[in-house]
Structure formats: C-alpha cells, structure tokens
Amino acid sequence: MQMNDISYEILDLFKKYGADKEGILKILEADSRPEVLYALSDIRRNLMDWMDFSGQENVLQLGSDYGVITGLLAERCDHVAVVDERDENLVVNQKMNDAYTNVSYIKAADFQKMETTEKEGKYDLVVLRSDRSEMDIKTIFAQAASYLSEKGRLIFACENALGFKLSFRRCP
C-alpha cells in the first residue's frame, strides 16, 4: 500500500504541537490517519531495530522518509548522511531528529554533484529506501553498492505485503 506524501501537513502539525516526542504523541492522538501513523510512529523502527550495527560507523541513508529510521541509525552509528530528492522530507526528518548532532542532510542534487572520490567506498552501511518504481532495480543496487566500503552492508527497505526483512552484504 503506497502512502500519500504528507510532508507539508506534518510540518504544519509540528508547528501546532511541536516536533519533540511529546509533540509527536499529541499529533498521533489528534490525527489517526494511516499516513500520519506511517510518518511519525516509532513502531516503524521495528524495520531495523533487530539489526546489529556494530562496526557501522559511517552510514548513508538514501531516501529520507520522515525520519523514524534516521533516529534509530543516529542512536546506534557514529555518523548518518541522509540524502533525499524532496527538500520537505529532509526538513521533516531534521525537525524529528533535531537532538542528534551526528546527522547531516543532503539534497539529492547536491549529492550527485559530489566528486566520486567523496562518496564511493566511503560508507559502512547504505540504507536504501525504494519508493521510485520507475527506476531500474539493477541500476539502483549497483549505484548504492558503489558507496559501500569493502566490508559494508546494504539494507534495502521497501513496502511489501509479506513483511520480509532482508539484508545483503557486499560480495567480492
């Protein structure tokens, strides 16, 4: 089930209730739409909460979403670089994770302009969210894998009806 993007609505709700944990709880009490639950509920941490992030110091998250997963990564890893095509998603994420000083937010266009040596082979973990069905999956995986360090891991997170949890390691 594909959720509608409600970034601007979430930003309005943050203005009204706040973006801290207390404010988010108030938002969830006041607005029970599935889109709001999807965007703000910390239950979504279950997607990766079970994973061991030992040795995953430098993380690249491709696809910001609203920031629930970013918060989990920021708690467990040394640095998280979040890349998204939508500025408003980065703003929502940044407001949700304002307490973390180890997260940097990068617009996708700026990330693409970075020199290859600045990003290829630099990340211990790449978290790839795929909500762009128009892109070729082989191209997406090849590009994401190029950012991994030699022993890096790639996590591919997508909406799926069966709830599979898969993780891939870089193969030589």
Predicted regions and their residues:
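Conserved class I S-adenosyl-L-methionine
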Residues: 55-65, 156-172
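A short acidic, Gly/Pro-enriched loop at the edge of an enzyme's catalytic core
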Residues: 115-126
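Conserved alpha-helix/loop element of class I SAM-dependent methyltransferases that forms part
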Residues: 38-57
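Conserved SAM-binding loop of SAM-dependent methyltransferases across substrates and taxa
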Residues: 66-77
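N-terminal auxiliary segments of SAM/dcSAM-dependent transferases
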Residues: 1-18
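A short glycine-rich, Lys/Arg-flanked "PGG" loop and its adjoining helix->strand segment in the class I
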Residues: 138-153
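Conserved SAM-binding loop
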Residues: 93-94
